[in-house]
Amino acid sequence: MNEFDPVALGVERDRLLAEARTVLIAAPGDDAMPEMGVTPVVRMDGALYIYPSRLSAHVRAVLAAGKAAFMVIEDESKAQNIWARKRLKFDAELVEIERNSDEFNAVCDVFADTHGPTMGLIRDFSDFHLLRLRPRGGVMVLGFAQAYRLSGEALDVTEHLRSG
């Protein structure tokens, strides 16, 4: 992709998000070292959701901060070059979805349909929190010299980043 084409780049962004089964998470920890983890992710009506347990240190850090950095990344087995795996990194604020809401039930059903029967087991566990990610912006990397700035909640492709 040589030209800056926001429409084509948006299609690639949407493909990366649609194929993602998990999202990597990083948040500041208590001792200023980042806490990192990974959790399944689903999309519903254009929004991204995670359902992690607060028993994990990275989830406690995320809940305390109310925001975190996230990344979806191309599967290693599909990458043309391991040094240039396609990835989408973004910062997001978190919105906790109340357990007694229609949204909670609908998203839990999507988790079960997407990721299998484990959701039926953990759905009622009180240490799990349903979180909607509200992106603020980020970067999409599609290969060498193919990094693009993403802006806003829709992660609009706004700029080709040509230098560090």
Give the label of every model feature segment:
Residues 2-7, 11, 109-110, 114-164:
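C-terminal edge-of-domain segments
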Residues 28, 55-117, 135-137:
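Short, structured beta-strand-loop surface elements
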Residues 32-34, 63, 83-85, 123-126:
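Short coil/turn motifs at beta-sheet boundaries
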Residues 46-47, 66, 127, 136:
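Beta-strand-connecting loop/turn residues
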Residues 1-63, 71:
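An N-terminal domain-cap segment
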Residues 22, 36-40, 89-91, 128-132, ...:
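Conserved hydrophobic/aromatic beta-strand scaffold that supports enzyme active sites
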Residues 42-45, 88, 124:
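Short glycine-enriched loop/turn motifs at secondary-structure junctions
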Residues 53, 73, 143-145:
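Surface loops and adjacent helix of pleckstrin homology
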